[in-house]
Amino acid sequence: MSARQEFASHHATFNHVWSSLLLEELFRLGVRDIALASGSRSAPLTMAAAAHPGFRRHLHFDERGLGFMALGLAKGSGRPVAVIMTSGTAVANLWPAVAEAQLTGVPLIILSADRPPELIDNGANQAIDQQGIFGRYPVYQQNLPSPTATIPAAFVLSSVDQALAQQARTPGPVHFNCMYPEPLYPGDAYLDFSAYLAPLGDWLRSSEPWSPWQLTQAPCPCQPDWDELQGKRGLIVAGRIQDPVQAKAVAALAERLGWPLLADLQSQLRFDGRNLVHADLALQHSGFVAELARAEVLLQFGARLISKRLGQFIKQQPWQAYWLIDPQPARLDPDYRLRRRLLCDPAAFAAAHPVAHPHLPWHRLAERQQAVSQQVRSACERFSELGVCHRLNQLIRGQLFVGNSMPARLMDMLGEAGKGPSRVMTNRGASGIDGLIATAYGFAQSVQPGSNEPTTLLLGDLSALHDLNSLALLGKSSRPLVVILLNNDGGSIFRMLPVPTQDALLETYYCLPHGLHFEHAAAMFGLHYRTPASLADFERDYTTALEKGVTLIEIKVPSSEVAEDLKALGSAIRGS
């Protein structure tokens, strides 16, 4: 809202006054995107969102997908995204997205409509107890009472200011539960609320928030033992870092220190030439492990590593010092090995900890990795899940969103140094296989307006079945979007785990083969469809799909192939 456009004084009901106040204050605090699902109890919020000229509105018919779409938007833009839905189980459907947002520090703002208190727990339709429905996961939650003239308008504005200030300090989801009595829709005439709004004074004509909280960013202090630490044999591990600019500071620090860099897929450094690109697989090679174990200290930037082998190596080493640098105020220490936790951005840490002069590398890990890299290339020469993921790592252009289970692991293991994607995003907080299509769509829409940058989603068949109705979102994409679907007919990751195989236990209760293909799903939702039969076909189909529209590329492979290929590759590495 511009400074010249005064806040409206005429509204249908008090419900609409409060909804307009709430959304206007969110806008003044920087919110620009709102995700909405249809519903009657949420009509005041929906009408306020539709009337506001400053919001981008994103619609979906399924609240579970809606929450994940908002999650992707917030992850991609780095800005809070509001989500509006009606009462009842519609709210409960947001639980998975709220959990992921809390675990990864993503700023969602949940605006749930609710029945008034007198219609809760008395048999009224579509009414459940929504207060505290998300448990301890919101970083701020408030049950807004039914709108009334006895509660000042400044209460609504001040509540929003407090919530977003808390969210800025501790990134994660915020929940406002809005208890609206009927009427929910406008009558024949709007009412004049000038007297009620008058105490807001200049706010009505301003573009500034009511009472913004002034947050100060404490500088990252230089650690007193830094000079001693940088003289040791060190290792730098890069975990989840969402900002490529922050990630570059980590790579530059590793290079100047002469320390090896092991970069997770989520670090934005996976394709950097300074990264030991096949370190996960090389941890099966005794010579590589012995050389890496000479490291005395560990600096880790970002948490939630995909590689289990790397996590086990870190857990087993007798580190003289182990520091984790991550701005998220959470205990990111699953093995209780950390000895120092620094709450700051990687670039702030690097700026506060200068390296006096470049150090020569203390290790020969690149040399040790060469044989492993050759084994990887040989294993990826044919059409398979390994081959497709290895080739995708070389062809990728634009943004990349990677699903959980096998896709994340394969993309983290394979590939080569090169240009790589502009950004990599995952849902590795709760690491669920639900909502991945919707999250990727939201991530794709976070690209700067006017850009035609493509987004690629890689996921498995069970993940696709979990979120099949979110394919309806993809047809709305204004930019190229490619879905690469690895269809191995079930949960083949369980073939990598020690599940007993007798009495068909593995197949019947874990892998859950379904025998389904996705050609008709693509047709139903108006998507282009390709099913390559060779790596050359895949390269042709993928590069074409990057240019325009939305394309689903289904990779049909035998169910047991990926497990067999990885076991064979591991044996070859251990024997090399």
Swiss-Prot record:
Signal sequence segment: none
GO MF annotations, alphabetized: 2-succinyl-5-enolpyruvyl-6-hydroxy-3-cyclohexene-1-carboxylic-acid synthase activity; magnesium ion binding; manganese ion binding; thiamine pyrophosphate binding
Tree of life domain: Bacteria
Cofactor(s) in the UniProt record: Mg(2+); Mn(2+); thiamine diphosphate
Pfam families, alphabetized: TPP_enzyme_C, TPP_enzyme_M_2, TPP_enzyme_N
Pathway participation: Quinol/quinone metabolism; 1,4-dihydroxy-2-naphthoate biosynthesis; 1,4-dihydroxy-2-naphthoate from chorismate: step 2/7; Quinol/quinone metabolism; menaquinone biosynthesis
Annotated EC: 2.2.1.9
UniProt remark on cofactor binding: Binds 1 thiamine pyrophosphate per subunit.
CDD domains: TPP_PYR_MenD, TPP_SHCHC_synthase
Keyword Coiled coil attributed: no
Catalytically driven reaction(s): isochorismate + 2-oxoglutarate + H(+) = 5-enolpyruvoyl-6-hydroxy-2-succinyl-cyclohex-3-ene-1-carboxylate + CO2
Swiss-Prot/TrEMBL GO biological process terms: menaquinone biosynthetic process
SUPFAM superfamilies, per database record: DHS-like NAD/FAD-binding domain, Thiamin diphosphate-binding fold (THDP-binding)
Keyword terms: Magnesium, Manganese, Menaquinone biosynthesis, Metal-binding, Thiamine pyrophosphate, Transferase
Job description of the protein: Catalyzes the thiamine diphosphate-dependent decarboxylation of 2-oxoglutarate and the subsequent addition of the resulting succinic semialdehyde-thiamine pyrophosphate anion to isochorismate to yield 2-succinyl-5-enolpyruvyl-6-hydroxy-3-cyclohexene-1-carboxylate (SEPHCHC).
Oligomeric and partner information: Homodimer.
NCBIfam families: menD (TIGR00173)
Family: Belongs to the TPP enzyme family. MenD subfamily.
Protein name: 2-succinyl-5-enolpyruvyl-6-hydroxy-3-cyclohexene-1-carboxylate synthase
Biological classification of the source: Bacteria, Pseudomonadati, Pseudomonadota, Gammaproteobacteria, Aeromonadales
